[in-house]
């Protein structure tokens, strides 16, 4: 079976094409569009510019799927559409222009599917899972391989930076402002922060950027998939520096995320401190794998079992 999954996110819109054969899932193609929908919010609604960006990406992906004769695909949206006050208008507009009606994933469901996806790549026992998107951050605490608590915070790398940063590069004062905003949101969860979770699992663009930047700056081996809390802290210190010699190398490694990098790293660093994490494992699997496993494979397998009975 070959199946396409389109993730309509707040910062990026992605297409993943999966092949399922002999009990194994293989990612055969991955496409990304930097849409920055979280920057297209005005008075709580998605603007015409944002709608046009979303429709452009969706029609592009429809063409890619059609060229490969892939008829089966699903489209879901996360904070990009769930947090706007003109959702129905936007959904109707997207349907009109693309023929697609995206499924809206709400926060807890997004966090759960993140966990399903990462569990396919790691033997999860105890730790914290974090998914920093453009418009939200999902957190999952798990013990003995099972979810203990999960939540979605409506603050992501892009909308946090939009709130606090006036220019392109964040100042030390703006970094402090972002820290205050994200810590207030974490406090509102009213979770028990007494227990330390040594291991964190990171998915999403900020986590991948953290690994990429750490490899370049700290001579971490190319095959390594983990970084430390010290790596993240040092990157934040570089980003908050007034010296261009300190912050420019960071942005140079990942220039496409210049408008969300500081926001994402502030969120990552503050969550690491809250839960006492020492090591961050970066997962290649995430929400799209979780969606494919939970929504598509499970349904297909259930239908097959029913047909046998």
Segment roles from a protein language model:
Residues 17, 40-67, 78-90, 96-126, ...:
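Helical "lid/coupling" subdomains associated with nucleotide-phosphate turnover
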Residues 135-141:
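Acidic, divalent-metal-coordinating active-site segment for phosphoryl/phosphodiester hydrolysis
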Residues 10, 134, 205-208:
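Short, glycine/acidic-enriched loop or turn micro-motifs at the edges of active sites
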Residues 23-28, 146-148:
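Beta-strand initiation motifs
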